[in-house]
Amino acid sequence: MILPSILLLVAHTLEANVECGVRPLYDSRIQYSRIIEGQEAELGEFPWQVSIQESDHHFCGGSILSEWWILTVAHCFYAQELSPTDLRVRVGTNDLTTSPVELEVTTIIRHKGFKRLNMDNDIALLLLAKPLTFNELTVPICLPLWPAPPSWHECWVAGWGVTNSTDKESMSTDLMKVPMRIIEWEECLQMFPSLTTNMLCASYGNESYDACQGDSGGPLVCTTDPGSRWYQVGIISWGKSCGKKGFPGIYTVLAKYTLWIEKIAQTEGKPLDFRGQSSSNKKKNRQNNQLSKSPALNCPQSWLLPCLLSFALLRALSNWK
C-alpha cells in the first residue's frame, strides 16, 4: 500500500491548485444496495458528471475536464445532422427535473479514428460557449494517474440512462450509480474478440450492475484510497445488452488519449494539462512544463519508489519556500 500512497502524494502536490476529483459537499459514505440495478447517487457525490441534452431531452453523459471542456464519447454524435447549437450541457445537479444550470456548446470534436463498426477510439470533446463556474456541485475530474497504480481501491459509474434493460423508456431523472471492478484485458478479450487495446472492461462480479442506453459518455471513476482524489479511468462506450450477467461493460481507456485531449485543447485555444487543470495562467504552465521534464518522472522501474519519494519531498520543500 506504500506505492499508491506515494502516487497520491505526488498527484496532490502537482494538483494543489486544481482541486480536481474532490467532492466538497459529499462528506459521508453510504453502503450501496442493489443505470441497471443502481442506487440513487447522493448530492455532490459525482460533481464532475454532466447531462448532454438535445431539445431538453437527455441522451448522453459526460464529465467536466476544465471550465471549457466536456469529455464524452464519439458515438453519441454519430448523426451528422446534430449541430453544436442543438446541444445543452446540464451541470451541478442530480435531478434533471430541477431548474438546471445549462451551458451552450460551440464545437463537437470527435476522434478522427472513431470506428462505428467496432467502437474503437470512441471519444469526443465538447467546447463550451462560456466557461464553467466551479463550486461544491461543479468540479472537474482528474485525468489518470501516472504511473497507473497496481490496483484501484474503489470504482463507480453513474448516469441518467435506462434503469430496466427490458424497458428502453425507463430513463431516470435522478442520477443513479453502480460500483465497478476493472477486469483483466486478456480475460475480457475471451468474451469480446473485437476488443482493442483502447478499451477496458468493468463489471461487479456476478451482479447485474451495468450502464445502459443514455449512460454512454459518462465517466468510470476510481480512487486508490478512501477519502482521496477521484480519477477518470474510462468512458462508458458499449456492451452486450445491459446488465447481462457474465458480460462486462466496455469503456474507452482514457489514459490512451491524454495527449489527444491536450492537442485538441491547445488547437482550440483553450489549453489544459494532463490533470484537467486550466492553463490560462502562463506561470502555472511554466511550472507544469518544468515538472513534466523532471528527471524523477523518468526513473527506471527498479528505482521508481525512491525517485517518487525524492520527487515528493523536493516538491514539498519548494512549495514551503
From Swiss-Prot:
Annotated glycan sites: 164
One function term, GO molecular function aspect: serine-type endopeptidase activity
Residue span of region Disordered: 272-293
Membrane topology of the entry: Lipid-anchor; GPI-anchor
Tissue: Expressed in adult mouse testis.
EC numbers: 3.4.21.-
Keywords: Cell membrane, Cytoplasmic vesicle, Disulfide bond, Glycoprotein, GPI-anchor, Hydrolase, Lipoprotein, Membrane, Protease, Serine protease, Signal
Disruption phenotype: Deficient male display infertility with impaired sperm migration from uterus into oviduct and defective sperm-zona and sperm-egg recognition/binding. However, the mating activity, sperm production, sperm morphology, sperm motility, inducibility of AR, activity of acrosomal enzymes and in vitro sperm fertility are almost normal. Male show an absence of mature ADAM3 in sperm.
Pfam families linked: Trypsin (PF00089)
Chief place where the protein resides: membrane
Disulfide bonds: 60-76, 155-222, 188-201, 212-242
Localization of this protein: Cell membrane; Cytoplasmic vesicle, Secretory vesicle, Acrosome
Ranges of residues in domain Peptidase S1: 35-266
CC terms in the record's Gene Ontology section: acrosomal vesicle; plasma membrane; side of membrane
Cross-referenced InterPro entries: Peptidase_S1_PA (IPR009003), Peptidase_S1_PA_chymotrypsin (IPR043504), Peptidase_S1A (IPR001314), Trypsin_dom (IPR001254), TRYPSIN_SER (IPR033116)
Propeptide segment residues: 295-321
Function noted in UniProt: Probable serine protease, which plays a crucial role in the fertility of male mice including sperm migration and sperm-egg interaction.
Family: Belongs to the peptidase S1 family.
Protein name: Serine protease 55
High-level lineage: Eukaryota, Metazoa, Chordata, Craniata, Vertebrata
Gene: Prss55
